[in-house]
Amino acid sequence: MVPVIALVGRPNVGKSTLFNRLTKTRDAIVAEYAGLTRDRQYGEAKWQGRTYIVIDTGGISGDEEGIDAKMAEQSLQAIEEADAVLFMVDSRAGMTAADQLIAEHLRKRNKRSFLVANKVDTVDPDIARAEFSPLGLGDALPIAAAHGRGINAMLEAALGIFPRDDEGEEGEGEAEVVAEGEEPKRVPGPSEKDGIKIAIIGRPNVGKSTLVNRMLGEERVIVYDQAGTTRDSIYIPFERDEDKYTLIDTAGVRRRGKIFEAVEKFSVVKTLQAIQDANVVIFVMDAREGVVEHDLNLLGFVLETGRALVIALNKWDGMEPGQRDYVKIELERRLMFADFADIHFISALHGTGVGHLYKSVQAAFQSAVTRWPTSRLTRILEDAVQEHQPPLVNGRRIKLRYAHLGGANPPLIVIHGNQVEAVPKAYTRYLENTYRRVLKLVGTPIRIEYKGGDNPYEGKKNSLTERQVNKKRRLMSHHKKAEKKRRDKKR
């Protein structure tokens, strides 16, 4: 499971600077859910091939209202959700009363905490360690977040306590080579044992719990329910029509005898972890409310992680025909960026349309993990280029030579050629749509990566042989004589 790291500390100690450095915010998946997260900011980060989630909390001043009152706003929940805490202090300002209150709270919560002394670029690290040793959280890890100093050592300490998942998900990452002439194939992964892992996500009160109960209803064969390693998330294997699935529930469903009691409990961390761990995401929206901003935020995270997607519009049965038409128009307008996903209009309460979700889940999963030979992908590229050539760059045509599969879940197609760094985004979208249409991909994002061929002669001066030099001299002499004869003739 993806580790969760919370950044905690009083105001202006550099939490946001460290957050931006860890997540590389320009490229990172950063989601801010106002009103739901109480101003906490969540981001996905990677270090040495490991993925983890970072929570940037608000500053804690420790004023007369007390540490608990302040932390209840945002930081207390972040600490509870986190696997480990990076407690940041300011080396320049030294230890304060607020630092002592926060350290005391962390010790009481018995959380895995690492003391991080920021801004050591102008302070001796040994002095900083001695300054904060009374906090009782071990030796401080000295860093300079603004300049990136000490970050690797800090991450080594914080992430080293978690087991490395070296196995990963089969079907992800680098794809194995499919021999020329072979048919596309799907390679069995861990999901063959536990079934396709489905995460049902969405805003609070859109009907996630009702849908979970409906999918695990009396007509289904429930094998067992087992608490996962994530806080309050439950992994529930079940079968339907002899197909195996594992439902990742983030709504707090608990089994009591034959009754599943649903407790609506929204947690951004649980949602993000469920998305990361799933093969397919069923995204639930409330048809009566249409598409709202929080839906777009969550959908954006799903697309960035590359997970296969099925959209379910719940509470459809109670709507008038005019309302339904309006919602469909809004969906088409606002969800253009996810137009590859199947949309189902359902009633989780009455079961209407729920059974059709499984067909889309299967299709999305197959599209996400199927592998194609290089010959097929290259032929599709050649046909696409012949139909619509890439633009000219400085008078030279961009050349796309061949394509191969670079990964799956989501499919990654690597295209080799010349001047590929100049390929416009519009042309990349054209290629994505072409591959999606020809390969009949549904329910999964598709990614295209370009690789250019290095010019072995770049930066090298061409040296001529003696024979070539003599030939060049003769040609130049001949050219001069011909030019002189032409001028004399004009006179």
Swiss-Prot record:
Residues 370-454 form the KH-like domain. This is GTPase Der. The gene is der. Signal peptide: none annotated. Residues 166-181 have a biased composition (Acidic residues). Residues 3-166, 196-369 form the EngA-type G domain. GTP 1 binds at residues 9-16, 56-60, 118-121. Residues 164-191, 452-491 are annotated as: Disordered. One of its GO terms (biological process) is ribosome biogenesis. The keyword Repeat applies. Associates with the 50S ribosomal subunit. Keywords: GTP-binding, Nucleotide-binding, Repeat, Ribosome biogenesis. It comes from Azotobacter vinelandii (strain DJ / ATCC BAA-1303).
